[in-house]
Amino acid sequence: MEVLKIILKILYYSIDIIIMTYFLYYFVTGLFVFKKSKVKNKIRKYKPTKKMAILIAARNESSVIGHLLESLNKQDYPKDLYDVFVIPNNCTDNTEEVARSKGAKIINCTVPVKSKGDVLKFTFDFMINNNPEYEAYCIFDADNIVHPKFLRRMNDALCSGFRVAQCNRDTKNPSDSWISSCYSLFYLVQNFFFNEARMKMGWSSSINGTGFVISRDVIKERGFSTVTMTEDIEFAAQCALNNERIAYVKEAITYDEQPLSFSASWKQRKRWSVGTIQCMNKYSGKLIKTWLKEGIPQAFDMGLFFLAPIIQVITFVVIFMLFVYNLLGLNVSDVIKFAYDNKMMSMALAYICT
């Protein structure tokens, strides 16, 4: 019995060290948000010059897409420098009719598509071959609302030399439920301590699935080919492998609708976790090799990011081990100490692993 207790204790502290090291990495990198940004990491203001295509993949979105299109029609950007394209796929409602009524152009998928990544791949190929006049592509989800200055600020990023950029993703419905409030807090923390911090470090921000811009040159050079359930972070991994910095554009704001119920949130988080693990299996080795060989910091950073679901599982194992250890006669003082430690870990993991 004593030997078993010693083994469990060694395992617990070993895993605890792994978790806290992971937390410490994000804590330290997050502190760079308070650092003064260097000139090379700043986005300057420019006159609108970039012609952009706004791409919206839509599946049965007739109830929400109209609001997005109205906000896009109100952009503080020359009308001759952007067009809105809606790509209906597998729809059984009148999404296409609503989009047309708001002035959007329609691209019909002529190949079978099962995911947003499939739709984007088809659309990018279509745009390169049929609409070469556009210099950049903006991707939105159909339930978004876009700030009037969005395109102008993304134009600034493109003119500043960035070829991929992520917006400031905010929440459209933060007060509708405690779930949507948690999402709102998460994105505030992620934008500040992750994206803005990395922008000041000269690293890459994350891509959050909506409100991001890709230069036409990037698509022409490498295409857009994703196979996992999370096409956004998979594309971010591909950018890291190619030393393509992703800018964070704080003043380009997208308001995104968040889940209201725990079941809806669980379904979404499950998909994100599965997709992240798929990306980890596919890219982690390549990212670490790229970091070791070429010294690209965002490759290392992205490799650690993919470990988030694993860290969540390890945290559960630690809690379970404590329970078993307690049954075997753990001191009450140790239980209290762990409860305090676990509270601190939970606060950290709310940011790291959400």
PLM regions: where:
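N-proximal low-complexity "stem/linker" segments adjacent to membrane-targeting elements
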Residues: 1-70
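Basic/Trp-rich segment in TM-proximal cytosolic loops or flexible interdomain/linker regions
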Residues: 1-12, 16, 34-45, 201-202, ...
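A conserved acidic beta->alpha catalytic loop
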Residues: 88-96, 111-113, 145
